[in-house]
């Protein structure tokens, strides 16, 4: 009888550990189709190619991976900027990306901006409010002509949720 009680007392702990392990195992390792980056997402994303042009009119493409997971949205994008995009002052390029995306924020401003390095490449991480009590967190990295961006949209109080932290910390530049 004592042995049965111990088993039933240990059962919730064993089930919780199994559930945590299953959640970890469910994360999807994503290597960009162009082999430029690696990131983990909590499921398999939808892949799209977004055609665009540089300010000088040279065509190029963004490779975009997006996932809706519960109340959370994850986006990873990369592009190889054409030669006519001047990347000699990467902070200006990163600031331009910040300014462009700030137009979509409630109030048109980021509430938090953190300039940093990711694997030696200039980067900026930012957080800002969206409508309806949601927020946007993004990380943009520019390594030479290689642009990599991670975006995370969720309720404003979930900007530092475990899923977000794992997503952002998993980024690795591969080329």
For every predicted segment, state its role.
Residues 34-36, 69-71, 131-133, 145:
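Glycine-centered tight beta-turn/hairpin loop motif at sheet-sheet or coil-to-beta transitions
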Residues 5-9:
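N-terminal export leaders
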Residues 62-93, 148-151:
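A short acidic-to-branched-hydrophobic micro-motif
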Residues 40-65, 97-143:
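Signature of long, low-cysteine stretches enriched in small and polar/charged residues
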Residues 33, 42-47, 90-105, 145-175:
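Surface-exposed amphipathic alpha-helical segments
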